[in-house]
Structure formats: structure tokens, C-alpha cells
UniProtKB/Swiss-Prot annotation:
GO terms for biological process: deoxyribonucleotide biosynthetic process; DNA replication. Binds 2 iron ions per subunit. It holds the Pfam family Ribonuc_red_sm. Provides the precursors necessary for DNA synthesis. Catalyzes the biosynthesis of deoxyribonucleotides from the corresponding ribonucleotides. Two genes for this protein are present in M.tuberculosis; this is the active form. When coexpressed in E.coli with nrdE the 2 proteins complement a temperature-sensitive E.coli mutant. Its cofactor is Fe cation. Tetramer of two alpha and two beta subunits. It comes from Mycobacterium tuberculosis (strain ATCC 25618 / H37Rv). The active site is at 110. This is Ribonucleoside-diphosphate reductase subunit beta nrdF2.
Length: 324
């Protein structure tokens, strides 16, 4: 050991009985209460419904889910992790580790769907497409650029836009199928993911606003300009990505409205004014209905389960019950 080496003389354990920010405990409890795993959703019940889709509709669905997998991979392995060094409290660090883990659960969820409904060749083709699609790769490049930078508040902006905006061009399609009574178990799983992402976007946006209160007015103005510039850049790319995916099935304009609707929600999470007027965000009511907790699948956004979510029940037994 060299003479210049310095040992850490004290390490503090996280104490949940001493909170600097009550929001950390509130969000932790919400996230852990919402915990779920994809293996508990019986996607196999959607096999007959999958068979009613055309070859083009199947390809579209797989490409949409592959794009979502890429975003979850980025958020789970880079995005949420990159926010940890800038956490203001140890409890915030804990929440961010939970977020990172659940993003990896989300990424695995799509593989669960693929392995149930698709052939290996189809899966490989979809992942190959994700690596070759210019707009999908550009989306990842833009976000990663800020995750790997050295400006904590800009990282939070990029993360909030990913959580609250970028996912939604993909989330549209399973809600569309669900509104037509197709792939309803898959839609139930996507609702579980959407519920998580809503909490993630809210929390990271909240932490951005807390950090914003600590900087001067000039920096605040610069960050606001940056946020809208980044949103415009991401939105323009997302429109091209949406056209590439949805033009053939005639859904592009509806998806764009859904994008603008969620872009406004992302800005609100960051404490900023909505960008798009109401007449440009009038989402198809069937999609909003499919998103709601009272959708046909009776998904409960707050209990951690939907009608498709299966959990074993404990039954009291006696020794004689095990004599076969």
C-alpha cells in the first residue's frame, strides 16, 4: 500500500427511520408494493389471439416490443444507475436501485412474450431489426449521450423523458390490440410495466425539481431551454420512428397524438408547462380506456396485480395430507 492511499474512515448504513425526504419512503413503498414478475402472467392464453393477426401485424408487434426492450435495457443498465452518484439521500439511492432492477424485469418481460408467441427465427429477426433501425438507434444514442455526461440535472431530464415519453410509441400498440379484445393477457403485462414507468417518471422528475431549487436563476433558465430542445429533438426522431412502424397499418396519426399527450405529461413531471395544445393531444378514447385501471382486464394499478396476474395461495395442511 502506498503512502498516498487513503482509507475510508467511516461508512454510514442507510437508516429508514431517519428520512431527509419523505417522498423516498413513499415511492419505495409504492414500488415494492407493485412488485411483479412476468412469469406470473399467463401470456400463453394469447396464443389463439396471436393466430388471428396477419403476418404484418405480428411483425409490427414484435418490432414494437423489441424497441421497448432496448429502452428498458438502457434504463436498467445505464440510465437509472447513472443517477445514483448524484442522489441527495441514501434512500434515493435505494429507490434508484429498485428502479434499475424493475427496468431489467421489464426487459425480460418482452422475452417472455416472444418465447411464448414467436419462433426463434422470428425473435432473432426482430432483434436484428432493432440493431439496424436508424431511428431506434438514434433514440438510444441521444439519451446515452446525456447519461454519460457530467451534468446531473440533464441526466434527470433525459431519464424523465425516456420514462414518461419515449416508451409510449410502443405502449400504444398493445393497448390498441386490447381495445379490440386481442392479446389481452399481453396487454395486462404491459399495464404492469406502464404503472411502474409512471412512478419512475414521476419520481425522477420530482428529484429534478428538488435539484433545480438548489441552482441559480441563470442555470434554471438554461435547463428549461435544454429540456425543450431535447424534447423537440427526441420528438422529431420519434415521429420518424412511428411512421416507419405504423404507416402500413394506418395508425401513425393516432400514435402521434399519443406521443404528444405523453410528451406533455413528461414536461409536467419536470415541473414545466405543456408544449402541445389540447387539439393535438386528443388521444383515441379506446386507447385511454384500455390504459385505465377499469379496462376489460380489470387490472388493478395499485394492488400489484391484474386479472391475468397469477399468484399461488397458501393452504394450511396436516401431516396426513402428504400420505400418498
Amino acid at each position: 500500500m502506498t503512502g498516498n492511499a487513503k482509507l475510508i474512515d467511516r461508512v454510514s448504513a442507510i437508516n429508514w427511520n431517519r428520512l431527509q425526504d419523505e417522498k423516498d419512503a413513499e415511492v419505495w413503498d409504492r414500488l415494492t408494493g407493485n412488485f411483479w414478475l412476468p412469469e406470473k402472467v399467463p401470456v400463453s392464453n394469447d396464443i389463439p389471439s396471436w393466430g388471428t393477426l396477419t403476418a404484418g401485424e405480428k411483425q409490427l408487434t414484435m418490432r414494437v416490443f423489441t424497441g421497448l426492450t432496448m429502452l428498458d435495457t438502457i434504463q436498467g443498465t445505464v440510465g437509472a444507475v447513472s443517477l445514483i452518484p448524484d442522489a441527495l439521500t441514501p434512500h434515493e439511492e435505494a429507490v434508484l436501485t429498485n428502479i434499475a432492477f424493475m427496468e431489467s424485469v421489464h426487459a425480460k418481460s418482452y422475452s417472455q412474450i416472444f418465447s411464448t408467441l414467436c419462433s426463434t427465427a422470428e425473435i432473432d429477426d426482430a432483434f436484428r431489426w432493432s440493431e439496424e433501425n436508424r431511428n431506434l438507434q438514434r433514440k438510444a444514442e441521444i439519451v446515452l449521450q446525456y447519461y454519460r455526461g457530467d451534468e446531473p440535472l440533464k441526466r434527470k431530464v433525459a431519464s424523465t423523458l425516456l420514462e414518461s415519453f419515449l416508451f409510449y410509441s410502443g405502449f400504444y400498440l398493445p393497448m390498441y390490440w386490447s381495445s379490440r379484445a386481442k392479446l389481452t393477457n399481453t396487454a395486462d403485462m404491459i399495464r404492469l410495466i406502464i404503472r411502474d414507468e409512471a412512478v419512475h417518471g414521476y419520481y425522477i422528475g420530482y428529484k429534478f425539481q428538488r435539484g433545480l431549487a438548489l441552482v441559480d436563476d441563470v442555470t434554471r433558465a438554461e435547463l428549461k431551454d435544454y429540456t425543450y430542445e431535447l424534447l423537440f429533438e427526441l420528438y422529431d426522431n420519434e415521429v420518424e420512428y412511428t411512421q416507419d412502424l405504423y404507416d402500413e397499418v394506418g395508425l401513425t396519426e393516432d400514435v402521434k397524438k399519443f406521443l404528444r399527450y405523453n410528451a406533455n405529461k413528461a414536461l409536467m413531471n419536470l415541473g414545466y408547462e405543456a408544449l402541445f395544445p389540447r387539439d393535438e393531444t386528443d388521444v383515441n378514447p379506446a386507447i385511454l380506456s384500455a390504459l385505465s385501471p377499469n379496462a376489460d382486464e380489470n387490472h388493478d394499478f395499485f394492488s400489484g396485480s391484474g386479472s391475468s396476474y397469477v399468484i399461488g395461495k397458501a393452504v394450511v395442511t396436516e401431516d396426513d395430507d402428504w400420505d400418498f
